[in-house]
Amino acid sequence: MAFLWLVSCFALVGATFGCGVPTIQPVLTGLSRIVNGEDAIPGSWPWQVSLQDKTGFHFCGGSLISEDWVVTAAHCGVKTSDVVVAGEFDQGSDEENIQVLKIAQVFKNPKFNMFTVRNDITLLKLATPAQFSETVSAVCLPNVDDDFPPGTVCATTGWGKTKYNALKTPEKLQQAALPIVSEADCKKSWGSKITDVMTCAGASGVSSCMGDSGGPLVCQKDGVWTLAGIVSWGSGVCSTSTPAVYSRVTALMPWVQQILEAN
C-alpha cells in the first residue's frame, strides 16, 4: 500500500515581526511540490524552514512558531545532529542570507504512531534563537476552537518533489493554493485511516509530495496566516486528484502549549 509519504510545519509571535504577516507579500495564482505548484516569491513565506542533515541534505520542511521553536512532522525523525535552515529560498544558491540553526531538543509527540501516522507532530527547541527579519519570522498558531471549513483556500509550501518519480527535488521553494477537503470526502479516498487529528486538502490538481513533509498548510484567519496543518502523508504517487493528509494543528494545540509552557 503506497500511502505513506510525510510532511510538516509551525510558528509563534515575534517581538517586532508579528506572526503570520510576511513583510514580503506572497502572490498565489491559485493554480498552483508540490506537484503542479509554482516558484514562491523569495522571502514571502518567512516561517518556512528546511530541515537538513549534517551533509546539507534537505529531508523535511518545518515552520517557525517563534524565535526559539520550530514545528515539523514526527515522521521526519529529526535528531539534534540535524540543523534548521531559515531564510532560504533557492537551495542551489550560496548568495542568500540564510540562518543555520542548531537544535537543542527534539520533542516528538509521545502518541505518534508510525503505522497509523496519527499525532504526527514534533517540536524543535533551537539552541540559538532565529533572528527575525523581513525574510525570517513566525507563523501564527491557531486557537483550539479555530475552524477551517471545507472549501477554505489555503497554501502549502516546500522543496518536495514536483513529480513523484523525479530524481531530485526542486532548488527553489514551491507554493500551491489548495482547498480544505471535508472529512467525509477525504474518507472516500482514505477510509478509516483518517482520524480527528488529521485534516485533508487538495484533490484540486495540486499535491504535496515527498520532501514537503513537516512543512506548513497555512490559512488566512483574521488577516494573518495561521498554521492549520503540517504536511504528513498522502498518495504514494502524489496524485493531484486525491487529497493529501496533514496533521490537524487545532487538535494538537493542547500538547503544543504544554511543551512550550514547560520548556
Curated annotation (Swiss-Prot):
A matching Pfam family: Trypsin
Localization annotation: Secreted, Extracellular space
Cellular component, GO annotation: extracellular region
Catalytically driven reaction(s): Preferential cleavage: Tyr-|-Xaa, Trp-|-Xaa, Phe-|-Xaa, Leu-|-Xaa
EC number: 3.4.21.1
Domain of life, per lineage: Eukaryota
Residues found modified as Phosphoserine: S93
Active site, UniProt feature: H75 (charge relay system), D120 (charge relay system), S213 (charge relay system)
Domain Peptidase S1: 34-261
One Gene Ontology term of the molecular function aspect: serine-type peptidase activity
InterPro entries: Peptidase_S1_PA, Peptidase_S1_PA_chymotrypsin, Peptidase_S1A, Trypsin_dom, TRYPSIN_HIS, TRYPSIN_SER
Predominant subcellular localization, coarse grouping: secreted
Signal peptide segment: 1-18
SS bond partners: C19-C140, C60-C76, C154-C219, C186-C200, C209-C238
GO biological process terms held by the UniProt record: digestion; positive regulation of apoptotic process; protein catabolic process; proteolysis; response to cytokine; response to food; response to nutrient; response to peptide hormone
Record keywords: Digestion, Disulfide bond, Hydrolase, Phosphoprotein, Protease, Secreted, Serine protease, Signal, Zymogen
Similarity remark: Belongs to the peptidase S1 family.
Protein's name in the database: Chymotrypsinogen B
Species: Rattus norvegicus (Rat)
